[in-house]
């Protein structure tokens, strides 16, 4: 669940367990117009996915590569990594060794780089985090169809700094028992969901003013270096990303009013941004990305 804050106030993440008493897990000030997001994952579903992942690797005789970002979000990706690796150790390690297969874990950005620059001969890429998994799936499909072009091109990445929020400023942890997670803004409930013991949760937000400052830097850098801009946003069903789109238009108008000619830009889905950067790059392009997308 994600939305744009309608009022400035204190936003709180609260857990209600079996005793019915609300326990505050996290709080922060949030300003009107700032985006926030709450997500959780089912540990049971991760376990099912892990069995399917390792069984397929054995069936197709492929080394298994798991990719997550447990260094940045240990209470979310780290929990999923632990779950998957427990399944591997308990059920599949001996069989992997028997048939000569290997299991590897690496950070998701390193995995993305390996897929493009140094892929093994036979590999099964495992990404239990759904959003990133879709991006890499679409990238692999595009690489199979188009490959990497030979033409000369210049690619720059403009990654939003970690201080801006998103995953790098997130609160993340596994819940200790079955219960309900709630998001409250100045005491008013904004969202609630059921969770089970061990399920990882993540709460993150960003600052509207930090977003606009970053967008302004992107425009000025692109103009200085004569680059086209390709933003990657999921604005059609993510209010969280839509605030970036609004910020882009606001900053562009401010620059125009200031007699500054903004460079040409496009807004596309993050998966399309990734595919274009690698399989169909322009002569000179800059690719602004949110924190974790920027890493990838």
Regions found by a protein language model. Name each.
Residues 1-34, 152-199:
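Flexible glycine-/small-residue-enriched beta->alpha junction loops
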Residues 2-3, 75-80, 115-118, 137-141, ...:
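Short acidic, glycine/serine/threonine-rich loops at helix termini
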Residues 5-8, 58, 71, 83, ...:
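Residue-identity detector for threonine
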Residues 9, 17-20, 33, 67, ...:
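Residue-identity detector for glycine
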Residues 15, 23-106, 184-268:
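Glycine-rich phosphate/diphosphate-binding loop of Rossmann-like nucleotide-binding domains
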Residues 53, 108, 155, 169-173, ...:
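A broadly tuned "polar low-complexity/structure-edge" signature
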Residues 91-154, 254-255, 259-296:
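Glycine-rich phosphate-binding loop
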């Amino acid at each position: 669940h994600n939305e744009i804050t309608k009022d400035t106030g204190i936003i709180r993440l609260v857990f209600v367990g079996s005793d019915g008493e609300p326990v505050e897990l996290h709080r922060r000030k949030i300003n009107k117009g700032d985006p926030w997001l709450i997500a959780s994952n089912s540990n049971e579903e991760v376990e099912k996915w892990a069995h399917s992942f390792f069984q397929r690797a054995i069936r197709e005789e492929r080394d298994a590569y798991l990719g997550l970002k447990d260094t940045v979000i240990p209470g979310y990706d780290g929990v999923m990594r632990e779950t998957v690796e427990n399944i591997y150790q308990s059920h599949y390690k001996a069989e992997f060794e028997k048939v000569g297969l290997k299991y590897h874990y690496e950070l998701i950005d390193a995995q993305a780089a390996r897929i493009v620059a140094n892929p093994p001969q036979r590999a099964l890429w495992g990404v239990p985090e759904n959003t990133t998994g879709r991006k890499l799936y679409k990238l692999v499909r595009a690489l199979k169809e188009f490959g990497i072009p030979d033409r000369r091109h210049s690619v720059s990445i403009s990654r939003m700094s970690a201080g801006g929020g998103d995953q790098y400023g997130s609160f993340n942890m596994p819940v200790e028992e079955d219960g309900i997670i709630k998001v409250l803004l100045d005491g008013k409930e904004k969202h609630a969901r059921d969770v089970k013991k061990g399920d990882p949760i993540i709460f993150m937000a960003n600052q509207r003013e930090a977003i606009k400052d970053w967008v302004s830097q992107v425009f000025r850098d692109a103009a200085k270096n004569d680059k086209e801009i390709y933003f990657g946003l999921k604005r059609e069903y993510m209010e969280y990303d839509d605030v970036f789109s609004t910020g882009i238009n606001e900053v562009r108008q401010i620059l125009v009013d200031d007699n500054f000619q903004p460079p040409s830009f496009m807004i596309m889905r993050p998966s399309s941004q990734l595919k274009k950067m690698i399989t169909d790059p322009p002569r000179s392009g800059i690719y602004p990305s949110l924190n974790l997308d920027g890493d990838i």
